[in-house]
């Protein structure tokens, strides 16, 4: 809101508040003057204190208005930071007004003064308005800034936006339970039945006591006891059914959340996985989703049950004694405020705990997945120490949570104790004065204990919900994330020749935005031909493969497949016609048959066997105990490096792809196996366009075209003999290998390491 509007509205209300309160006070004291009322003030008879409270809150609002008007930049921020002040003022005045009503009731039974009731009601109206106006002043912007587009709302610090965000997250979370509406309706029915049964129990307990103490009737006592038993049995049965249904509903919610999150993750662009650690993603997928469903299910169940119980309890409490009910409600606003403060703090801590746990999970996942490397360097103890340090960070946050919970329980428990002592003392006064029976007092005290338990549960529900919402926000952050690279191509021709053209391709990884990996790279792959990429480590060979697989978007240029941009092809179709075999292929924990046919809907077993024979894998597969049904283990751990490469080669060949990419695909094979695979590929070239990255001279020299890369640029192209005749980089690489100075056609032997989540191979 614009500044002048907020100031005008606030000043108008302050004037009206002072005017109305003064008028009511004057009409209620026509028989004496203000000075006489001040000199002979009697808290049981005068409303001068309520008029003084009006002046105090008006001065507070005037001060806030002046502060915002004089400094429209810092003023609203200061008001947002001091929201606790106006909350405490409104709370204290509201409690004092209730106490005033009780004091008046002691000398005026009943209270028939209309001016007192008018001032009593107006006090609460003005308190609510004062609180809202304080929030209004805290959201204003300078007039010039308010006129700018996009500045209509408040987006700064403060509690309101955070509360709205939490509410929106909770609402969105509950929207995932829409398929289970029928279950929720049934659970709500049994919840109401159970809560109503529990609500009537104290009432009939009081009736049983009155039948003994007052009526002294055994029949009435027996009737009351039978009703109590029936209510207890019925409410227990309904509560059990309610709990079972809620557990089922939120188990389905957990599955739904995990499914949505996993689908969102696998649809993200490749750069997303370079920027996010695997452990963090696994933590979101497992611990966070479980925490969300468990905490939300438990706390919503408790919240709904206690809401119904509180409604019934309040009705019975007012029917038994409106005076004791007012005493009871004097303390609960304080408990609610403490719960609110604690819930916000706990929500922030919960987010930090989840992030710390995710970091610990990342460390554990990284260590366990590379256990052979850890053991080869005898670094087990150091890795355990690193993990312990991560856990200690979690423990520090847990200690803060424990301290916050201790303070919350102490504050709310002390307030509740004060309320209970006040009820007992004032209730005894009402019984002695004949305004209440002993049975009603006992019933009221039981109701007060029930109400206290309900409010305490609601307080813990709030903190639990905030913890669940904190985890849900992290889950929805990934569920709602839209991939920056969308695979929305539609081309899927029946016939594909397999010609590939790189035209002035410029490329940079998102994790290294200032390093150009490829610069104006141009070359072509011809159908029926073998093209080899060679060059030093980091020259851009593997990046060309990543681009051809459409893993990353380009910064410049384009890659064409049969004259069409690769992004124009259907995602499934593109990766059916382009197959990649990498140096360290990944196999899944499935059978060999499932690994070879991976990604294809239906593949005849004969085609699987044929592909395995071409890849020289059929022999070792048949020697395994279960043959093609043998489980490969996690990441193919049950197979050797050479066996994994041959299975991966079969996985590529079973598709009969027009374009075949071999990225050091035979590096782990013996000479005989490599020769057989090369013969299978070269003997069927009319059906493939082949791109190879290899460092063995025997593999490279047979290529129809050799493309030499250096520092992201194409420096030479030609056949083996042509490039040797030209001299240059390729001739140097060949000379180094022939002299035994370096094993591969590369400056750095063995550079082909798989890229980590934070680094890319080029």
UniProtKB/Swiss-Prot annotation:
Keyword annotations: ATP-binding, Lysosome, Membrane, Nucleotide-binding, Peptide transport, Protein transport, Translocase, Transmembrane, Transmembrane helix, Transport
Family that this chain belongs to: Belongs to the ABC transporter superfamily. ABCB family. MHC peptide exporter (TC 3.A.1.209) subfamily.
GO molecular function term, any single one: ABC-type oligopeptide transporter activity
Membrane topology: Multi-pass membrane protein
Record remark on domains: Divided into an N-terminal domain (TMD0) comprising four transmembrane helices and the following core domain (coreABCB9). TMD0 is required for lysosomal localization and LAMP1, LAMP2 and YIF1B interaction. The core domain is required for homodimerization and peptide transport activity.
Tissue specificity note: Found in testis, particularly in the Sertoli cells of the seminiferous tubules. Also expressed in kidney, brain, heart, lung, spleen, thymus, intestine and testis. Higher expression detected in brain and testis than in thymus and intestine.
Function field: ATP-dependent low-affinity peptide transporter which translocates a broad spectrum of peptides from the cytosol to the lysosomal lumen for degradation. Displays a broad peptide length specificity from 6-mer up to at least 59-mer peptides with an optimum of 23-mers. Binds and transports smaller and larger peptides with the same affinity. Favors positively charged, aromatic or hydrophobic residues in the N- and C-terminal positions whereas negatively charged residues as well as asparagine and methionine are not favored.
Name of the molecule in the record: ABC-type oligopeptide transporter ABCB9
Site note Intramolecular salt bridge with Asp-17. Essential for the release from the ER, residues: 57
Compartments where found: Lysosome membrane
PROSITE patterns the record matches: ABC_TM1F (PS50929), ABC_TRANSPORTER_1 (PS00211), ABC_TRANSPORTER_2 (PS50893)
Gene: Abcb9
Site (Important for the second trafficking step from the Golgi to the endosomal and lysosomal compartments) location in chain: 45, 49
Site (Intramolecular salt bridge with Arg-57. Essential for the release from the ER): 17
GO cellular component: ATP-binding cassette (ABC) transporter complex; endoplasmic reticulum membrane; lysosomal membrane; lysosome; membrane
Main location: membrane
Species lineage: Eukaryota, Metazoa, Chordata, Craniata, Vertebrata
BP-aspect Gene Ontology terms: peptide metabolic process; peptide transport; protein transport; transmembrane transport
Domain ABC transmembrane type-1 per the UniProt entry, residue ranges: 184-467
Organism for this UniProt entry: Rattus norvegicus (Rat)
Assembly: Homodimer. Interacts (via TMD0 region) with LAMP1; this interaction strongly stabilizes ABCB9 and protects ABCB9 against lysosomal degradation. Interacts (via TMD0 region) with LAMP2 (isoform LAMP-2B). Interacts (via TMD0) with YIF1B; this interaction allows (but is not essential) the ER-to-Golgi trafficking and strongly depends on a salt bridge within TMD0.
């Amino acid at each position: 809101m614009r500044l002048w509007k907020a100031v005008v509205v606030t000043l108008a209300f302050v004037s009206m508040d002072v005017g109305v309160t003064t008028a009511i006070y004057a009409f209620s004291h026509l028989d004496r003057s203000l000075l006489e009322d001040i000199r002979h003030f009697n808290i049981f008879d005068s409303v001068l204190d309520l008029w003084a409270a009006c002046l105090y809150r008006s001065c507070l609002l005037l001060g806030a208005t002046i502060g915002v008007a004089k400094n429209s930049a810092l003023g609203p921020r200061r008001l947002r930071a001091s929201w606790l002040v106006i909350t405490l003022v409104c709370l204290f005045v509201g409690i004092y007004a209730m106490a005033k009503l009780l004091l008046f009731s002691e000398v005026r039974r009943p209270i028939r003064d209309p001016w007192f009731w008018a001032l009593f009601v107006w006090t609460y109206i003005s308190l609510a308005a004062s609180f809202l106006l304080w929030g209004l002043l805290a959201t204003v912007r300078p007039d010039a800034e308010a006129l700018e587009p996009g500045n209509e709302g408040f987006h700064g610090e403060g509690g309101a936006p955070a509360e709205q965000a939490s509410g929106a997250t909770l609402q969105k979370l509950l929207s995932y339970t829409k398929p289970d509406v029928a279950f929720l309706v049934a659970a709500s029915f049994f919840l109401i039945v159970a809560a109503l049964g529990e609500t009537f129990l104290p009432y009939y307990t009081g009736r049983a006591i009155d039948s003994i103490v007052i009526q002294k009737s055994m029949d009435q006592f027996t009737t009351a006891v039978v009703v109590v038993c029936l209510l207890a049995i019925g409410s227990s049965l309904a509560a059990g059914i309610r709990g079972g249904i809620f557990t089922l509903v939120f188990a389905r919610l957990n599955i739904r959340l995990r499914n949505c999150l996993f689908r969102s993750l696998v649809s993200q662009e490749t750069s997303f996985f370079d920027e996010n650690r695997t452990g963090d993603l696994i933590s979101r997928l497992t611990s966070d989703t479980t925490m969300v469903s468990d905490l939300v299910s438990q706390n919503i169940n408790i919240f709904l049950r206690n809401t119904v119980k509180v409604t019934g309890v309040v009705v019975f409490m007012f029917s038994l004694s409106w005076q004791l009910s007012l005493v009871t409600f004097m303390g609960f606003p304080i408990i609610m405020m403490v719960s609110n403060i604690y819930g916000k703090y706990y929500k922030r801590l919960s987010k930090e705990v989840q992030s710390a746990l995710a970091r610990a999970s990342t460390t554990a996942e990284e260590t366990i997945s590379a256990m052979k490397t850890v053991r080869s360097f005898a670094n087990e103890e150091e890795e355990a120490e690193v993990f312990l340090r991560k856990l200690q960070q979690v423990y520090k946050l847990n200690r803060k949570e424990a301290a916050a919970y201790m303070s919350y329980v102490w504050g709310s428990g002390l307030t509740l104790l004060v309320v209970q002592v006040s009820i007992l003392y004032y209730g005894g006064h009402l019984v002695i004065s004949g305004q209440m029976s002993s049975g009603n007092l006992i019933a009221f005290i039981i109701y007060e204990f029930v109400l206290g338990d309900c409010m305490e549960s609601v307080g813990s529900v709030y903190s639990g919900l905030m913890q669940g919402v904190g985890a849900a926000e992290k889950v929805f952050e990934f569920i709602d994330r839209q991939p920056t690279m969308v695979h929305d191509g539609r081309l899927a021709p029946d016939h594909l020749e397999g010609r590939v053209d790189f035209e002035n391709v410029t490329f940079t990884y998102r994790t290294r935005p200032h390093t150009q990996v490829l610069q104006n790279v141009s070359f072509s792959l011809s159908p029926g031909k073998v093209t080899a990429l060679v060059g030093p480590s980091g020259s851009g060979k593997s990046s060309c493969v990543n681009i051809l697989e459409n893993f990353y978007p380009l910064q410049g240029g384009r890659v064409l497949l049969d004259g069409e941009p690769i992004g124009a092809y259907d995602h499934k179709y593109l990766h059916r016609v382009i197959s990649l075999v990498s140096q360290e292929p990944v196999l899944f924990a499935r059978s060999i048959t499932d690994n070879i046919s991976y990604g294809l809907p239906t593949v005849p077993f004969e085609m699987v066997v044929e592909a395995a024979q071409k890849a020289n894998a059929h022999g070792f597969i048949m020697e395994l105990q279960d043959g093609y049904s043998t489980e490969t283990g996690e990441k193919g751990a049950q197979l050797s490096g050479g066996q994994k490469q041959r299975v991966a080669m079969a996985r590529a060949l079973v598709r009969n792809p027009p374009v075949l990419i071999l990225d050091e695909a035979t590096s782990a094979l013996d000479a005989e196996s490599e020769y057989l695979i090369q013969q299978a590929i070269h003997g069927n070239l009319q059906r493939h366009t082949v791109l190879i990255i290899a460092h063995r001279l025997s593999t490279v020299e047979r290529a129809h075209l050799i493309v030499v890369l250096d520092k992201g640029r194409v420096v030479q192209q030609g056949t083996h003999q042509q490039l040797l005749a030209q001299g240059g980089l390729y001739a140097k690489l060949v000379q180094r290998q022939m002299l035994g100075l370096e094993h591969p056609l590369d400056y750095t032997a063995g550079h082909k390491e798989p890229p980590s989540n934070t680094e890319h191979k080029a």
